[in-house]
């Protein structure tokens, strides 16, 4: 049975049961995507892993959760009964992510929190329930895979060159490694 067939069969299930099933799936996929309030694991895990591993994780793994939410919302739960809740969760994810990023002094933690914020933008597009919102979410997810992976790879270069990922000790990077500083700036 594929997702489209499951979606057709879902119409036979009472609305309350459908909402409960979608809620449980959203919690599971929300953990993977790191949406608020299920994002606490991400900022602590990415800074501790090697930069190459973090680049792959940041670029791909959180987007698996976003992809699962997109597939579930568009193929199985097409009525959009939880779109308003999803929108509020997305807004909270954006806010928590960016406020967390502002408070960081480590570049990997800063990028981890901004990643959470960006996931909020993707989920917001899904929550709109329109073709434009969905297209924007998909485009942004693909774009974010490339950009976030590149950023964490450059952070790996910065750590290798400077010996630290602390923002307080990277002020002279433009003088000691101008090419790496420019790569990160771009």
Which residues does each predicted region cover?
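Hydrophobic transmembrane alpha-helices and their helix-loop junctions in integral membrane proteins
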Residues: 1-186
């Amino acid at each position: 049975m594929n997702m489209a067939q499951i979606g057709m069969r879902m119409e036979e299930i009472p609305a309350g049961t459908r909402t409960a099933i979608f809620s449980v799936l959203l919690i599971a996929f929300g953990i993977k995507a790191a949406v608020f309030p299920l994002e606490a694991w991400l900022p602590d895990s990415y800074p501790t892993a090697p930069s190459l591993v973090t680049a792959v994780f940041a670029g791909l793994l959180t987007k698996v959760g976003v992809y699962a939410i997109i597939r579930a919302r568009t193929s199985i739960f097409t009525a959009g009964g939880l779109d308003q809740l999803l929108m509020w969760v997305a807004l909270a994810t954006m806010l928590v992510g960016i406020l967390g990023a502002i408070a960081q002094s480590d570049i990997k933690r800063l990028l981890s929190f901004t990643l959470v914020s960006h996931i909020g933008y993707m989920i917001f597009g899904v929550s709109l329930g329109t073709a434009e919102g969905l297209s924007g979410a998909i485009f942004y997810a693909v774009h974010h895979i490339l950009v976030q992976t590149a950023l964490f790879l450059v952070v790996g270069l910065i750590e290798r060159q400077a010996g630290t990922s602390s923002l307080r000790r990277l002020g002279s990077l433009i003088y000691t490694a101008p090419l790496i500083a420019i790569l990160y700036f771009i």
